[in-house]
Design a protein with these regions (language model features):
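Short, leucine-enriched amphipathic alpha-helices that occur as contiguous helical runs
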Residues: 3, 7-15
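Conserved phosphoryl-transfer catalytic core
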Residues: 60-68
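Amphipathic alpha-helical segments used for helix-helix packing
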Residues: 97-125
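Helix-turn-helix
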Residues: 9, 17-59
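Hydrophobic faces of stable alpha-helices that mediate helix-helix packing
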Residues: 61, 99-106, 128, 132, ...
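Hydrophobic alpha-helical connector segments
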Residues: 55, 68-104
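Amphipathic alpha-helical packing segments from all-alpha helical-bundle domains
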Residues: 65, 81-86, 117-144
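Short alpha-helix boundary/capping elements
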Residues: 50, 61, 81, 113-118
Length: 147
């Protein structure tokens, strides 16, 4: 098995563990067991549980091609409308037809809120940094245009 494939296997196992047990209730040992590897091998790929968490966070934010498209738009009222429609549409889609991976992400978020909230805070911060500048600039342009 290649290093990249093993890394993805570990991340997949970690997502399941974090979604089921929360950040505090998940250990690197339990992630290693879920990935059917030794804890030492897990540490070759990720130096800590927090590093695993951060990698999942980065994947969640960067995996959405629609978000990448929106962030590439020129700030404007139209971009602001697209951003809001995209955010609302995302959550409506989750409600109507969540796929397995999306359901797992939602469990991870809910579990985080029920636990210490660390993952949720990190995700909100990451999303805020990704979307915030475009959102704020688009809102400013809309206000300046009187829209």
């Amino acid at each position: 098995m290649t290093s990249d494939l093993r890394r993805q296997l570990i991340l997949s196992a970690a997502k399941r563990c974090f979604a089921r047990n929360g950040f505090a209730g998940t250990t690197t040992k339990s992630v290693a067991a879920a990935a059917a590897i030794s804890e030492g091998l897990l540490f070759k790929h990720f130096p800590s549980k927090a590093a695993l968490y951060a990698e999942i966070l980065a994947e969640e934010c960067e995996a959405d091609p629609d978000l990448a498209h929106l962030l590439g738009q020129e700030p404007s009222t139209a971009t602001l409308v697209e951003l809001v429609q995209g955010m609302v549409g995302h959550f409506m889609q989750l409600r109507d037809a969540p796929d397995q991976e999306e359901a797992q992400r939602m469990r991870l978020m809910v579990t985080s809120h029920l636990d210490d909230g660390e993952f949720a805070r990190l995700l909100y911060d990451k999303v805020g940094k990704l979307i915030g500048p475009t959102f704020a600039a688009s809102l400013d342009r809309a206000i300046a245009a009187g829209e």
